[in-house]
């Protein structure tokens, strides 16, 4: 069993070895370190930018100091020299930093650095030339101013000349804006002063000496100052700074991209490692799950050990499956492959669940159409099964082919919503269901073998009893016939009021009872002659309904319900009559107060074989005769013995124990089967399955020859039947019974016929001919005569003597004997 139904052991490939996972962890750490580590030399870059900013500042300061020295406001040239030194030092530091950085080799910074060096060299040369010439110029201006101020004249005092003159005015103008014209005029004025008499010669000589110097140096100094002021050192430094920032930004972008890539790679490796570890964990859990499944199979096998019933064993197994899959409910249903009818239902809890037939048929159809032979669905629990307790949430529904004829449908119910299970869990559920179905099939076969063994033992016991009874029955019948014959002779020769007549009646009554017992014994021995003919069970039951009513106490009500389908079987109606009488009498004896006996005739189809207490019923079509009562029921301990000969629970009250034994014999003679279900305190139900016949049924009157139909004396019987052929058949039957038939097609025709003064002793009306506003219960009032209603297949009658005056309802078909008794009864009343 385990070798066949245990899961197939597979090689679970984990996809990674432990050493490979360790290598991936190391790689992830390396990538993470590279992602967070610093790539560029930020300090060098910041130092380069700082040096460039210093060059900008020193260049601006140098231009300021040169401007102050040119205007004469600053006579100290040390700041200028220190600025030049600072610029030189910054340039050397910048070259050193550039050699340490990769920026020079990867950008235009090297060319800009060379331009910056050239610009600084030019500025340095210009400053040095400016320093030498500006000192000489300032000295000449000072001497020129002093000499000019010592001359008398109209010169006005200024910051430069204390006694301005015309010469002073022109010199000031020349200082502000040197030009050749002004220089020429100043030269003419100096010559004039030299030629002018009466002036101090010393100042004039100074003016003549220093004036030309000023006129020649001032334009040169102006040019040097302009050269220094327009130096592109600061501009080149700014360009170099922008270039460095741009290169630095590009490097940052590349570095950021690389960091993102390395970080992503590290994170990806970490996620992959987590996935590998998760898969290893899942596979480990799955292996543990498979081991638990092995234990599940063993536990299911243990449930079917011993002598427990199949239902209780299956229920225990379903509880194990429910616990294994952590479900709240678990149910299994076996469905016929072709008919799509449920054969058996098992549940982990009591009572058994009631399945939704539409969902069941749908999933069975899908299972038949699916080549994989397995259908899995998850839908609402309320759409699958009506559980004894309201289980909200979802149900897992799995169907697969259990055998060639059966489909197993397993349902797991959950109170809370759950995700779809993995394919492995579905496979385990399918295998567990297959294992359970296998055990159920084995137990069923074992039960069938046990039933067949008991049936063989019962048949051997019946054969022994029949052999013994058959040997003495005929001799005993001869003796009993002689006794009854002489008793009847004595009865006819004695007056009715005699005490002896009463004793003789007792003898005859006891003899009749003894004959019944002999008939039952002959039935057990199968030595009684049988007359086999096809007949309708519905017609027979309708025929013997008055006889059944007479055999029962007045406190028992009989209820009949017939199927519209044909219910023809082959056999002896006398035997079926005896079956009905015996079962109904037993039912009435189990009732202490007013009781109800229901007799139902229908068609039944059995999709698979059914195990009964006294045999196995094969699948197929049957005529089902059900007799149920609401009596006290049969105890469970007594139920297996009710068909045994001479077994009786009423031995003290005259029970022989042959009634149900003869019933079993009669049903076996019909090649039928009988199934009994009973609940103590609620009643008993006998289901008699009889094989149907396709032959035309004969009239039951041919079996009841001694019970001749009563005849009439020419009374008029009016008949309303819309079917022409059926109306003619009824008229022939009525005429054969000694009555005068008058047929009508519609109810209005007979009403018009009576309104014209015609009279009828009895009216028979087909229910189909009644108008919609005409109630069947008021036909006799409308037609002012007794009426019999014909039609329908349901017969609900209480044939007590107090009800003979009420309307009589006859179901179709109507036998001649039934019609004769009904007409005679209504005419007499």
From Swiss-Prot:
Coiled-coil residue windows: none
Domain Response regulatory: 716-827
The UniProt record lists the keyword Cell membrane: yes
Recorded GO MF terms: ATP binding; phosphorelay sensor kinase activity
GO cellular component labels: plasma membrane
Protein topology in the membrane: Multi-pass membrane protein
Modified residues (4-aspartylphosphate): 766
Domain of life assignment: Bacteria
Matches recorded under SUPFAM superfamilies: ATPase domain of HSP90 chaperone/DNA topoisomerase II/histidine kinase (SSF55874), Homodimeric domain of signal transducing histidine kinase (SSF47384)
UniProt keyword Transmembrane, yes or no: yes
InterPro entries noted in UniProt: DAHL, HATPase_C_sf, His_kinase_dom, HisK_dim/P_dom, HisK_dim/P_sf, Sig_transdc_His_kin-like_C, Sig_transdc_resp-reg_receiver
Subcellular location: Cell membrane
CDD domains from the UniProt entry: HisKA
Catalysed reactions, semicolon-separated: ATP + protein L-histidine = ADP + protein N-phospho-L-histidine
UniProt keyword annotations, A-Z: ATP-binding, Cell membrane, Crown gall tumor, Kinase, Membrane, Nucleotide-binding, Phosphoprotein, Plasmid, Transferase, Transmembrane, Transmembrane helix, Two-component regulatory system
Membrane-crossing segments per the record: 19-39, 260-280
Listed EC numbers: 2.7.13.3
Domain Histidine kinase: 471-694
Modified residues (Phosphohistidine): 474
Predominant cellular place of this UniProt entry's protein: membrane
Functional description taken from the UniProt entry: Activates VirG, by phosphorylating it, in the presence of acetosyringone or hydroxysyringone.
Name of the protein: Wide host range VirA protein
């Amino acid at each position: 069993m385990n070798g066949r139904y245990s899961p197939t052991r597979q090689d679970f490939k984990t996809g990674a070895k432990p050493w490979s996972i360790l290598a991936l962890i190391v790689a992830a750490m390396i990538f993470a370190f590279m992602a967070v580590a610093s790539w560029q030399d930020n300090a060098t870059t910041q130092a380069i930018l700082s040096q460039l900013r210093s060059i900008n500042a020193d260049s601006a300061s140098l231009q300021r100091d040169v401007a102050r020295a040119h205007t004469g406001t600053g006579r100290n040239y040390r700041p200028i020299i220190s600025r030049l030194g600072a610029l030189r030092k910054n340039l050397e530091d910048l070259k050193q930093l550039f050699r340490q950085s990769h920026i020079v080799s990867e950008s235009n910074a090297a060319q800009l650095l060379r331009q910056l060096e050239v610009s600084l060299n030019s500025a340095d040369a210009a400053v040095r030339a400016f320093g030498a010439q500006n000192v000489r110029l300032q000295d000449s201006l000072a001497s020129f101013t002093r000499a000019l101020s010592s001359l008398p004249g109209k010169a006005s005092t200024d910051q430069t000349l204390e006694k301005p003159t015309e010469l002073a005015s022109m010199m000031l103008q020349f200082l502000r804006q040197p030009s050749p014209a002004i220089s020429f005029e100043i030269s003419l004025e100096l010559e004039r002063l030299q030629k002018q008499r009466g002036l101090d010669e010393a100042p004039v000589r100074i003016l003549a000496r220093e004036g030309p110097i000023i006129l020649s140096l001032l334009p040169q100094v102006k040019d040097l100052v302009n050269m220094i002021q327009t130096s592109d050192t600061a501009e080149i430094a700014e360009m170099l700074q922008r270039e460095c920032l741009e290169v630095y930004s590009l490097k940052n972008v590349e570095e950021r991209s690389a960091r993102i890539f390395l970080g992503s790679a590290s994170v990806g490796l970490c996620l992959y490692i987590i996935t590998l570890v998760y898969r290893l964990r899942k596979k480990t859990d799955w292996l543990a799950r498979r081991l638990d499944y092995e234990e599940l199979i063993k536990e299911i096998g243990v449930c079917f050990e011993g002598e427990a019933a199949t239902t209780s064993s299956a229920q225990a197994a379903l509880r194990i499956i429910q616990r294994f899959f952590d479900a709240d409910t678990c149910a299994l249903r076996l469905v016929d492959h072709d008919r799509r009818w449920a054969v058996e239902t098992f549940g982990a809890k009591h009572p058994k669940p009631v399945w939704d037939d539409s969902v069941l048929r749908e999933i069975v159809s899908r299972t038949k159409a699916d080549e994989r032979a397995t259908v899995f669905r998850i839908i609402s629990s309320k759409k699958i099964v009506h559980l004894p307790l309201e289980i909200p949430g979802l149900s897992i529904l799995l169907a697969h082919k259990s055998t060639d004829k059966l489909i197993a449908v397993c349902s797991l119910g959950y109170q809370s919503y759950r995700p779809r299970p993995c394919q492995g869990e579905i496979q385990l559920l399918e295998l567990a269901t297959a294992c359970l179905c296998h055990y159920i099939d084995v137990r069923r076969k074992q039960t069938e073998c046990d039933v067949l063994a008991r049936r063989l033992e019962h048949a051997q016991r019946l054969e022994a009893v029949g052999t013994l009874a058959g040997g003495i029955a005929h001799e005993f019948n001869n003796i009993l016939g002689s006794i009854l014959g002489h008793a009847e002779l004595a009865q006819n020769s004695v007056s009715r009021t005699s005490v002896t007549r009463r004793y003789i009646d007792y003898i005859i009554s006891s003899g009749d009872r003894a004959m019944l017992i002999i008939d039952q014994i002959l039935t057990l021995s199968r030595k009684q002659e049988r007359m086999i003919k096809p007949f309708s069970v519905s017609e027979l039951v309708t025929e013997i309904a008055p006889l059944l009513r007479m055999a029962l106490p007045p406190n028992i009500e009989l209820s009949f319900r017939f199927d519209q389908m044909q219910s023809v079987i082959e056999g002896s109606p006398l035997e079926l009559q005896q079956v009905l009488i015996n079962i109904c009498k037993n039912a009435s004896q189990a009732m202490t107060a007013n009781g109800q006996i229901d007799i139902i005739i229908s068609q039944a189809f059995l999709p698979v074989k059914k195990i009964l207490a006294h045999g196995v019923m094969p699948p197929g079509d049957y005529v089902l005769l059900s007799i149920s009562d609401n009596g006290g029921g049969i105890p469970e301990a007594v139920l297996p013995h009710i068909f045994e000969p001479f077994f009786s629970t009423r031995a003290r009250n005259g029970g022989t124990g042959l009634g149900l034994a003869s019933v079993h014999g009669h049903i076996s003679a019909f090649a039928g089967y009988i199934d009994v279900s009973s609940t103590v305190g609620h009643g008993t139900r006998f289901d008699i399955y009889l094989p149907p016949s396709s032959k035309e049924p004969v009239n039951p009157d041919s079996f009841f020859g001694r019970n001749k139909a009563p005849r009439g004396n020419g009374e008029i019987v009016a008949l309303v039947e819309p079917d022409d052929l059926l109306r003619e058949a009824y008229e022939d039957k009525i005429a054969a019974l000694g009555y005068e038939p008058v047929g009508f097609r519609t109810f209005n025709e007979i009403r018009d016929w009576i309104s014209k003064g015609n009279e009828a002793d009895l009216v028979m009306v087909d229910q189909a001919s009644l108008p919609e506003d005409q109630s069947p219960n008021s036909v006799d009032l409308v037609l002012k005569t007794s009426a019999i209603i014909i039609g329908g297949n349901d017969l609900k009658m209480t044939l007590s003597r107090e009800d003979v005056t009420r309307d009589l309802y006859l179901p179709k078909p109507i036998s001649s004997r039934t019609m004769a008794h009904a007409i005679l009864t209504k005419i007499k009343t």
